[in-house]
């Protein structure tokens, strides 16, 4: 048995804490705290086992999750060492960046350039795609824009607009590889391109067709068609057809071609696609299979590896800082909750790979960890009386109320209070205004959403699917994991623009619904075993009598598939006031959580996939 004793905050100097951040617009009385019972203060520590229900010395019955806890050796994290911050590596990276910029700039933007007019369009697209997939595109934003502006001139021309493009501006015929790569890349960068260009690659029966010889060139063309099809918007039938055709073609090709860098790339993309494909994991894969036949290709790969390892040095320091924070607030002693701070840091560093985005990575990891701890408290461990006290304490936002909480909640409350305040100050440096009141309102809405679910569990009530989804998309905590991190990104977000990306704006609402639905399809059995009957699966079955679990999951997955297309549109639609960097960060948060749910629940217990992600993107540098 493990003893829960969270006392590191009891000795904290409360005189240092005041409540200057009280919401002036809200005057609330919180009787649960005013009438805080003395017996709560004197409650003994709680002994927890791995069974479904336990009791402590005063007879309180509790449910606990059957989790295996911290999967990572703290001594290993503390001892992580790297030499990639040495000046020689930084200097080499700078040299390689300049060499690649020279390559970009040597293309020019005029028709009289040195690059062959028979390949100039594809070469530009290939260069942009390569630096993005290798994770080094932040160095070449101006060069990328110039290259894509050039390609778009021809993609949108009267001749090519309906047919697609050839490999070069003077190509006599259209090319599937160039057109698919162009459609994907231009769309992701906000250029108005239509998927109708793919109609030109169908036969007279309206079916996509290829030669059947399956040359490497043809396979790569279909691979880029597959990649493009994943960036579909609602109602794009040709993109649906392209996804079906390319998936079948590539699976068939894998059975015929020899094991090679191409086959490895195909296997990876078929497995992770786009919506479950963490950028840093793809970068590691791509640098391992990237061709190195020319000096230029060798420089691209070398820069990618050097940058990967320089960032690895920064990850080491940030992860050690996060672990100190985790220990300071007594989280290791909370044996009823999941200890997955390392995993959450990994997720953050997989989607925010610019070294300057340290505040984003750490804030994301901490907010995600809070959501996990509170989920375990509200759904499993806490009593109704304790949950009401904690809910009231969050609304009060005052460190003095910690005395009214049971022992195991004290450290959690102070961690939330301190960290949210700290991140609000960090955001103020970027936003030029205090965002704490806004963030507190988000926390109130979030914490309130837990109480109906706790009552459902207590009473055995099973809501309708819509009733469940309306509440659970808030309690899932997506808004909490997104809001404060994006406020630190360096982009000013005035209140009216922030509301276009924050809940309940459609963009944020879609992310919340997608993750709630996908998460439930992976977790509902384990949740049910802990006494949590309500899930999107069980509620959908309630609304549709006679439906099997398998059928319900199939329909929910179909919902997610369609919602992802809506999310694509919300991300890439024109005339949006929200900076694309902020939308992309929120979108990538959806991708990384979706990655964790791809095959099973990657959060209840670290799966092979999650462990692999931590090792390949955080713990292990790339061999040079």
Curated annotation (Swiss-Prot):
Q: Which domain of life is it from?
A: Eukaryota
Enzyme class, one word? Answer: lyase
Annotated pathway: Terpene metabolism; oleoresin biosynthesis; Secondary metabolite biosynthesis; terpenoid biosynthesis
Q: Where is the transit peptide?
A: 1-47
Which residues bind Mg(2+) 2 per the record? 375, 379
Its job: Monoterpene synthase (TPS) involved in the biosynthesis of monoterpene natural products included in conifer oleoresin secretions and volatile emissions; these compounds contribute to biotic and abiotic stress defense against herbivores and pathogens. Catalyzes the conversion of (2E)-geranyl diphosphate (GPP) to (-)-beta-phellandrene.
- Protein name listed in UniProt: (-)-beta-phellandrene synthase 2, chloroplastic
């Amino acid at each position: 048995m493990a003893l829960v004793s969270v006392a590191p905050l009891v000795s904290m100097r409360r005189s240092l804490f005041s409540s200057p951040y009280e919401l002036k617009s809200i005057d609330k009385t919180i009787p649960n705290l005013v009438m805080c019972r003395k017996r709560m203060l004197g409650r003994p520590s709680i002994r927890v086992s791995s069974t479904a229900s336990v009791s402590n010395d005063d007879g309180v019955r509790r449910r606990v999750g059957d989790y295996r806890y911290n999967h990572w050796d703290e001594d290993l994290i503390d001892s992580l060492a790297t030499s990639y911050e040495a000046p020689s590596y930084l200097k080499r990276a700078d040299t390689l960046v300049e060499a690649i910029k020279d390559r970009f700039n040597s293309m020019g933007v005029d028709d009289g350039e040195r690059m062959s007019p028979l390949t100039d369009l594809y070469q530009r697209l290939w260069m942009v795609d390569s630096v993005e997939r290798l994770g080094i595109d932040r160095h070449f934003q101006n060069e990328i824009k110039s290259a894509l502006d050039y390609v778009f001139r021809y993609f949108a021309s009267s001749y090519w607009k309906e047919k697609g493009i050839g490999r070069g501006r003077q190509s006599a015929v259209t090319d599937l590889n160039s057109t698919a790569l162009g459609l994907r890349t231009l769309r992701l960068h906000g250029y108005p391109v239509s998927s109708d260009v793919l109609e030109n690659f169908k036969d007279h029966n309206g079916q996509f067709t290829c030669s059947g010889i399956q040359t490497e060139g043809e396979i790569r063309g279909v691979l880029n068609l597959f990649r493009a099809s994943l960036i579909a918007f609602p109602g794009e039938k040709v993109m649906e057809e392209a996804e079906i055709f390319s998936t079948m073609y590539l699976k068939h090709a894998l059975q015929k071609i020899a094991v090679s860098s191409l086959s490895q790339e195909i296997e990876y993309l078929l497995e992770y696609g786009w919506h479950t494909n963490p950028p840093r994991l793809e970068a590691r894969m791509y640098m391992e299979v990237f061709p190195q036949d020319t000096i230029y290709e060798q420089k691209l790969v070398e820069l990618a590896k050097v940058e990967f390892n320089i960032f690895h040095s920064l990850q080491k320091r940030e992860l050690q800082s996060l672990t100190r924070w985790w220990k300071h607030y007594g989280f290791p002693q909370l044996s009823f909750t999941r200890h997955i701070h390392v995993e959450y840091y990994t997720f953050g560093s997989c989607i925010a790979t610019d070294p300057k985005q340290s505040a984003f990575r750490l804030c994301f990891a901490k907010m995600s960890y809070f959501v996990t701890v509170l989920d375990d408290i509200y759904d499993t461990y806490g009593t109704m009386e304790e949950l009401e006290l904690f809910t009231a304490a969050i609304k009060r936002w005052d460190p003095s109320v910690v005395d009214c909480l049971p022992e195991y909640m004290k450290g959690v409350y102070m961690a939330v209070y301190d960290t949210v305040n700290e991140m609000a100050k960090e955001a103020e440096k970027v936003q030029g205004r205090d965002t704490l009141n806004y963030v507190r309102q988000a926390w109130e809405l979030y914490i309130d959403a837990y109480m109906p679910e706790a009552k459902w569990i207590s009473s055995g009530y099973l809501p309708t699917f819509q009733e469940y989804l309306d509440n659970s998309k808030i309690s899932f905590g997506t808004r909490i994991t997104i809001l404060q991190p994006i406020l630190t990104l360096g982009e000013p977000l005035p209140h009216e623009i922030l509301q276009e990306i924050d809940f309940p704006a459609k963009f944020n609402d879609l992310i919340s619904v997608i993750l709630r639905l996908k998460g439930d399809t992976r977790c509902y059995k384990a949740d049910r075993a802990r006494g949590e009957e309500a899930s999107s699966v069980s509620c959908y079955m309630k609304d549709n009598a006679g439906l099997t679990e398998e059928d319900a999951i199939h329909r929910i997955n179909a919902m997610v598939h369609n919602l992802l297309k809506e999310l694509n549109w919300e991300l890439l639609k024109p005339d949006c006031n929200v900076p694309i960097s902020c939308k992309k960060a929120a979108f990538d948060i959806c991708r990384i959580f979706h990655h964790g749910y791809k095959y099973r629940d990657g959060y209840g217990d670290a799966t092979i996939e999650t462990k692999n992600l931590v090792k390949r993107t955080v713990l292990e540098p790339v061999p040079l």
